[in-house]
Amino acid sequence: RGVCTRVYTTTPKKPNSALXKVCRIRLTNGFEVTSYIGGEGHNLQEHSVVLIRGGRVKDLPGVRYHTVRGALDCASVKDRKQ
């Protein structure tokens, strides 16, 4: 787990095109990593405490983790079909 230091969007590698949501996270062990925020819409901002899991995003260079939706400060995906 860690604290968001920056929440922003990046563009994927060719030939894909999107504005993928990612955040920079300072972990409790001192590492600073980039993590992908999955799902439609999110409530993360600077200083949000999030839980991350492994799993890279193939078309975003340097993104090797996913934020866990519905844990700590990260809300689950709103209006997601059950």
UniProtKB/Swiss-Prot annotation:
An example Gene Ontology molecular-function term: rRNA binding
A Gene Ontology term for the protein's cellular component: small ribosomal subunit
Signal peptide range: none
Organism domain of life: Bacteria
Pfam name, any one: Ribosom_S12_S23
Residues where 3-methylthioaspartic acid is found: 59
Example of a GO biological process term: translation
Keywords for the protein's UniProt record, in alphabetical order: Methylation, Ribonucleoprotein, Ribosomal protein, RNA-binding, rRNA-binding, tRNA-binding
Coiled coil (UniProt feature): none
PANTHER family according to UniProt: 30S RIBOSOMAL PROTEIN S12 FAMILY MEMBER
Subunit structure: Part of the 30S ribosomal subunit. Contacts proteins S8 and S17. May interact with IF1 in the 30S initiation complex.
Alphabetized NCBIfam families for the sequence: rpsL_bact
Protein purpose: With S4 and S5 plays an important role in translational accuracy.
Family: Belongs to the universal ribosomal protein uS12 family.
Identification of the protein by name: Small ribosomal subunit protein uS12
Source species: Actinobacillus pleuropneumoniae (Haemophilus pleuropneumoniae)
Gene field: rpsL
